[in-house]
Amino acid sequence: LKTQAPWLILGATMLGNGGVFCWYSYISPLLTQVSGFSAESLTVLMVLAGFGMVAGNLISGRLSDKYMPGRVAAIAQGMICVALLLVFFLAQISWLNVLLMCLCTAGLFAVSSPQQVLLIRYSKGGEMLGAASVQVAFNLGNAIGAYCGGLPLEVGLGYKYPALIGSGFA
């Protein structure tokens, strides 16, 4: 961790995760109050979000083996940014919001594998510390994202606004 590269990767990891968790921390009220889903349907919707996570992880792992991990991470992060912007503008269309939810969760887990590969690659002599540090970056992103996603709600803006804040992080 003596060079700049691992720190840039850790920062990108934190911001990328933060962007998703700005939005995902408030997904239940977004789905019920904006998209019109019932509270009873949330279990099924969260299972769909989980399928997105699994698919994103599997796909990006294979892509990171075949292509440059930095490119895979950048494309996944770009997909998250666009999907979060679309959530902000189109969340009232229920089926589209579910599709965007799956894209965002796929992107969250798609970006993780290549970032971990990059961090270990650029942490020569400190691979174990790099691998441990990436978990810290994920968790910091989660906490900071949830906090920042709640800020527009604190001032009375609607449940679509955490997605807008998240797109800025992404």
What spans do the regions from the language model cover?
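Juxtamembrane helix-start elements in MFS-like secondary transporters
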Residues: 37-46, 93, 97, 127-131
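Paired intracellular helix-loop junctions of major facilitator superfamily
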Residues: 118-128
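Small-residue (Gly/Pro/Ala) motifs that create kinks and tight helix-helix packing interfaces
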Residues: 28, 60, 144-153
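A membrane-interface helix-boundary motif in multi-pass transporters
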Residues: 151-170
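Helix-to-loop junctions at the C-terminal end of transmembrane segments
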Residues: 56-69, 153-154
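C-terminal transmembrane helical hairpin of 12-TM major facilitator-type secondary transporters
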Residues: 70-115
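Extracytoplasmic gate region of multi-pass secondary transporters
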Residues: 5-47, 51
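Short hydrophobic/small-residue motifs within alpha-helical transmembrane segments
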Residues: 50-51, 139-141
